[in-house]
Structures are given as structure tokens and as C-alpha cells.
Amino acid sequence: MLTVQSIPAFNDNYIWLIHNSHNHCVVVDPGDATPVLKVLEEQSLTLDAILITHHHHDHIGGISELKRHYPNLNVVGPASEPIPGISQSVEDGDQVELFGERFMVLGVPGHTLGHVAYVGDGKLFCGDTLFSVGCGRLFEGTPAQMFQSLKKLAALPDETEIYCAHEYTSSNLAFALVAEQDNPHLQRYREDVSRMRAQGISTIPSTLRQEKLVNPFLRCEQPSIKKSVADKAFDDSDLETFAALRRWKDNF
């Protein structure tokens, strides 16, 4: 069983640290090396590898500094994105072994064209593809690509823990509560999130089961969501419902 802890970075990023019982660890999307090195020193951990989901600087900015401290680091990342320092390129369907656990690589284009996610041990590290109550902006991909990527993630077991890369839950809730005003699960989740954030507690990880109840981008087949975007969508297909929802959120 692997343990996961968050390392906050910048304003709202989470760098995820995965470690085993023998004080060896992996970090996911280290945009900044400084907080990572601090945790490694404080907890006497040895860094073995880095997992990268996509090429944006707030996810890769710490690679070079971490490699200076750990020259033999294996840096795993998407094959189709220009990321300096990658030593193991991966794509959809590949596997990465971490401390005896096999993690599957999932291609999830949308936020960026080469974006990947890693799933194993009941945990999904999905970068900026799926957030709690939200999804990533389409900087490079199309609505159809992101829609299919989210469907791929939604097909994972409901108990899968969702480790996204940003603390966006409160702002995402503000939009979701407009998009689906009568969803009782959203009302309850808002109360939970407000309490957690007031206490300085992270809302991540979420679970896939929870997201299917509250995340409008995973609920595009629901009549309540279709009704909300009816004046913004070109038709009532699930894909166009998603596209209209994403356009709405971009300008919310």
C-alpha cells in the first residue's frame, strides 16, 4: 500500500508525493523544487522518480533542480510533449512500476494535446484534466478530445481516489451551483468544502463516486445540465452539452 501526501506550491498547486514504507518516494508534477526538497529532508525520504502529466511550467519547473540533487532520477512523462529532462517517455497504454505497484498510463488529451494521467493502487493522478467539480481549460485540445478523456476517467472504479493538481474546488463549486442549482449533493458538498477550507484542509483527494454526483462535466447526460445550457448549445448531444458547459465556465 502506497501513501500519498500533498506538497502545496505556488498559489493553489499540489505536488503529490507517493512513498512506500522504506522511505523511498516519487513526486508528481513538481513545478517547484524548493518545497519538495524541504519535505524530503524533513522526512528523510529518498526521491527515486518523477511523474509528469503535461508540459506546463507549473508542473515541470522543478525538474532540473531535483535532478541536480538526485542525478539518477527517472523522470517519466508524455512522449509527445516537449519536456526537458524526461528519461522515460510514455503514452496511452504504457505501464510504470512504482514500488511493486503497476500504474497504467492513460492518454487524456484536452488541456494539452499530450496530457497523460497515471492510475494504480486505486489512485488517479490526473494533472489538469479532471478537478473536483470541474475540468481543465482547453488550451490545446478540442471539446471532443476532453469529453472523451473525461469519459475514459469516468470508466474507472467509483472508489478511485482523484489526485488533481490544483485546489480549485471552491471556485468550481460556485459555477456548478449555477449550472445545476437543484442538485442536493452539490449543496451538501458546498457545506463540506466551506468547512474544510475554513480550517485550511485540502479538499483533495476526491473520489470518482463523489465527482459523478457533483461534477457537471461528468454529468452531461443529465437533463438538468442539458436544460442549463439549452440557450448556449447548438444541439442537445452530450458532447455539445459538454462543449457549451466548458464555454460557459471559461467566461464565468
UniProtKB/Swiss-Prot annotation:
Zn(2+) 2 binds at residues 58-59, 128, 166. Its cofactor is Zn(2+). Zn(2+) 1 binds at residues 54, 56, 111, 128. GO terms for biological process: methylglyoxal catabolic process to D-lactate via S-lactoyl-glutathione. SUPFAM superfamilies: Metallo-hydrolase/oxidoreductase. The keyword Metal-binding applies. Binds 2 Zn(2+) ions per subunit. It catalyses: an S-(2-hydroxyacyl)glutathione + H2O = a 2-hydroxy carboxylate + glutathione + H(+). Disulfide bonds: none annotated. Belongs to the metallo-beta-lactamase superfamily. Glyoxalase II family. NCBIfam families: GSH_gloB. PANTHER family: HYDROXYACYLGLUTATHIONE HYDROLASE, HYDROXYACYLGLUTATHIONE HYDROLASE GLOB. Monomer. This is Hydroxyacylglutathione hydrolase. It comes from Photobacterium profundum (strain SS9). The lineage of its organism: Bacteria, Pseudomonadati, Pseudomonadota, Gammaproteobacteria, Vibrionales. The gene is gloB.
